[in-house]
Amino acid sequence: VLHGCHKTSGTHLVSEQPVERGRPDTTWQKAPQIAPRLSYPSVFRISDARELIYYRTDGHTSSWTYRISEDNGITWYGPEQDVTDLDMKGRVDWSSYQTKLPGKDGKFLHVVFTDYDDNKHSPAPERFYNPRYDQEVSNEWKYNLYYVKIDLQTHEVRNAEGKTLQTPIDIDYSKANCQIWDTEWRGAGVPPAVSLNKEGEPTFLHVLSEDDVRSHRYYYVRRENGRWGQTPICSSSHQWNSCHLRHDDDTIRAYVVAGEEYLEGGYMDRHGGGRIEEWTSRDQGTSWKKRRILSPTGDHYTGWRFNNVQAVVRSDGSEVEGMLLFYGWNDSEAPKAKAFLVHK
């Protein structure tokens, strides 16, 4: 168990015996520190019964890296160099938001990220100027998409073309070697969802601003014949609206947050929300149709907003088929929400 991590080492516990259904008591002991600071840790079971934790090493502008354990979390090791550190060569405050997913065999890690100027040291409003919209925005707008593939045996980091990259990756090196989509100053609050297609290749679902900073759209991003393409799916109501992507045998399923009006203000609404919809494609992502609304409807839920749609995962990080989790609220100011579970 690892909890309480945000710019701290958190609390790391290991059970003395395997946790099993029906066992009345579980005894936990404090485990060694994984790293001095961890933020946004993601944990996966990978090849050879190893465990992987991928994390940001401190605050917004810090590097991202990973550690691997072969003994149930007692000891950890990792690469000599971190994977990314966008502001390491003088581009002060350049940062990234990242999503990651192991390959089907657990030998590789797929990582996709956006970039943004955090503008925290010697802040200057003009650094938030967005030329597409001819206005200042904020650090809540993240741009472009970048992709790397990490070999979890050798720690080599490669781009989509298979080129071995120098690490840590800074912002200029990233633009030259890792960029898969120049969004031309269209921005998002969240990084994309990632899912593997039937060939085991990564595909992405990403929300982006459109005609102005109050209109948004979801895109399906994939690589075909050596080129990255993007297909629009549907409109959305906020740059912080989440999403989830899943590949079934002959259908791609996109779970999105839709709405007609841009949300702003309030403790809860300032980070988006709307209704949860499922959109599907049966032609490899070329065209999409809305299949259903997943979030509750009816008089009791009039005015509710929903967000953070995600898969239910097992202890090894794999998804439970047919189950989704999301959150909803009706008070824009109260810092609380209810969880909803969908099992088709």
Predicted features by range, described:
Residues V1-K344:
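Extracellular, repeat-based ectodomains that mediate carbohydrate processing or recognition
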